[in-house]
């Protein structure tokens, strides 16, 4: 008898509010439980200790919020995008909600292997008194025009000067803060707080990571000139 392959889905979700302090492993466990509670027909690995066949795209550092997180999952059967979203969201708090579910082609690569960029919104942390955003915005045009942005990159064994400018794809004023589109993924990866630190140095203001909130807007695949959201890999069903 021919074995039927599992269906591959990609799920987009939010991580907001106080759940920004929940780590990646806890988020994985959270979704494993949510999938069970929603009674979705997820696939399990073979062997003595079966686990759900899900994998996450680009783990987020503690303290960041997002409306553009993704994970992939294999399922034995599916209903519809709307039904599966509703069943998952009914099991979860408002801070974590599924925004979209798409079906992937059989030959689709895992999301973690195709991430190339992410964009972010940087704004004042309302829980802190310091507000250096106006100074950063004033210095932003000059910063955006720089050909080179060097930072001291620390490793376990040494410190070295690194030019991060090629990894800053776009940076501009956005709402009451800063928008930045940065390289992200296994090939090139630039943390947004490093850019904020470089901006502070350029503007001549002290850098304190806790003065700012960092919110991921979307996670992308493709080359710099032709970026697409990870949700463009498939179709709703």
Model feature map: region roles:
Residues 12-14, 18, 22, 26, ...:
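Extended, well-folded interaction surfaces typified by the phenylalanyl-tRNA synthetase beta subunit core
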Residues 13, 73-79, 122-128, 180-184:
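Short beta-strand-to-loop capping motifs
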Residues 44-75:
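Short, charge-patterned binding micro-sites
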Residues 84-92, 133-144, 195:
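Short amphipathic alpha-helices in soluble, non-transmembrane regions
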Residues 142-237:
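Core RNA-modification/binding signature centered on pseudouridine synthases
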């Amino acid at each position: 008898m021919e074995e039927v392959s599992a269906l591959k889905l990609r799920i987009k979700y939010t991580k907001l509010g106080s759940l920004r302090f929940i780590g990646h492993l806890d988020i994985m466990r959270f979704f494993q439980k949510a999938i069970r509670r929603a009674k979705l027909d997820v696939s399990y690995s073979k062997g003595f200790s079966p686990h759900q066949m899900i994998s996450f795209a680009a783990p987020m550092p503690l303290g960041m919020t997002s409306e553009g997180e993704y994970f992939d999952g294999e399922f034995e059967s599916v209903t519809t995008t709307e039904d599966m979203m509703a069943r998952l969201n009914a099991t979860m708090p408002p801070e974590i909600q599924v925004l979209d579910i798409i079906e992937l082609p059989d030959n689709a690569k895992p999301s973690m292997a195709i991430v190339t960029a992410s964009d972010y919104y940087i704004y004042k942390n309302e829980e802190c008194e310091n507000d250096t955003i106006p100074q950063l915005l004033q210095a932003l045009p000059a910063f955006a025009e720089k050909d080179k942005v060097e930072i001291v990159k620390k490793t376990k064994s040494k410190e070295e000067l690194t030019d991060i400018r090629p990894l800053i794809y776009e940076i501009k004023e956005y709402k009451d803060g800063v928008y930045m589109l940065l390289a992200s993924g296994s090939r090139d990866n630039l943390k947004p707080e490093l850019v904020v630190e470089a901006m502070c140095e350029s503007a001549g203001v002290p850098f304190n990571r806790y003065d700012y909130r960092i919110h991921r807007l979307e996670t992308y695949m493709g080359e710099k000139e032709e970026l697409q959201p990870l949700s463009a890999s498939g179709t709703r069903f």
